Amino acid sequence: LFDYDFKPMEEELGIDCFTKIENYQAIGKPELMYNKNVSEKVQALSERLEKTANEDEFFDHVTQFYKDYGVGMFGLNKAFRISDNNGKVEFQAINNMEKVMLDDLVGYEIQKKKLVDNTEAFVQGRKSNNCLLFGDSGTGKSTSIKAIVNEYYDQGLRMIEIYKHQFKDLSNVIAMIKNRNYKFIIYMDDLSFEEFEIEYKFLKAVIEGGVETKPENILIYATSNRRHLIKETWNDRSDVQVDNGMHKSDTMEEKLSLVHRFGVTINYSKPTQKEYFDIAIELCRRLGVELSDDEIKAEANKWELSHGGISGRTAQQFINYLLGKQ
């Protein structure tokens, strides 16, 4: 096929499309270009096929490609979201996912190790738990989960992002992926519920407590600024009883039972000022900002006072500001 001469056909039909294809030069993509990951893999396969000596070698390359990456959008994409098409749940690939790795997140080594240990057990087929990453905003919870997907994508890990209003579709989503030859993280960002919201009951039933056994290729990873996910009010304590010195409240237990369904909970707390300065200095060194440590500390301190306080996100925004001035 690669040696076939299309010129006689083009002359007969008065076309030149095959000549254009044969001389096509792909446009270079910057690092964060949409879907670069997919096009790189297809391009690599094309180059291997071009060098094949015979049909058997051609067949081996193609079958190995599908063995490594699977077929369809699950094969070539890392992350997905769901949509409702006239009552039918459909997956949509997220083509512009941030290409962040765990080493890009400065600090939080204990937290990252707990997340890595659980995820490695999952992709290797060992027992693992649903994870809740909770703590102050801007501390790297969402970044850690995105990085985990990037780190373990080549081992068959995929991510499906689901929003709170879509929890009613969770059972359908699980039914669609439970027999796939991939490991799926169902990702819920900024998970929390007001006292009047009942969507958490869908989530509780899916995580544990339903009749059907949870598939071994699915875990739920969630982030939240709240430790207990569901907002409590003093009314929740209205049914508190005293029984042999123990306080009990059915309403409180009902709400707290959701967080208990996450076997691994990881606290991402706000950094101290020293840790904040360390993050800012490390990011400056990585990205080539030419300031002394003392200058970075002074500027970072002024920045956080007027931009929402100390956090890893504040440090990153400060670095972006410095890079924009260069």
Predicted regions and their residues:
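Interdomain "pre-motor" coupling segment immediately N-terminal to P-loop NTPase/helicase cores
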Residues: 26-91
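N-terminal pre-Walker A segment at the start of P-loop NTPase domains
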Residues: 94-120
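Conserved P-loop NTPase mechanochemical-coupling segment
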Residues: 99-103, 142-165, 193, 231-232
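Walker A/P-loop
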Residues: 130-160, 172-179
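Conserved nucleotide-sensing/catalytic segment adjacent to the nucleotide-binding pocket
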Residues: 157-162, 171-215
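Conserved catalytic/switch belt of AAA+ P-loop NTPases
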Residues: 194-244, 250
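Conserved AAA+ ATPase "SRH/arginine-finger" region at the nucleotide-binding site
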Residues: 241-256, 263-277
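C-terminal alpha-helical "lid" subdomain
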Residues: 265, 269-326
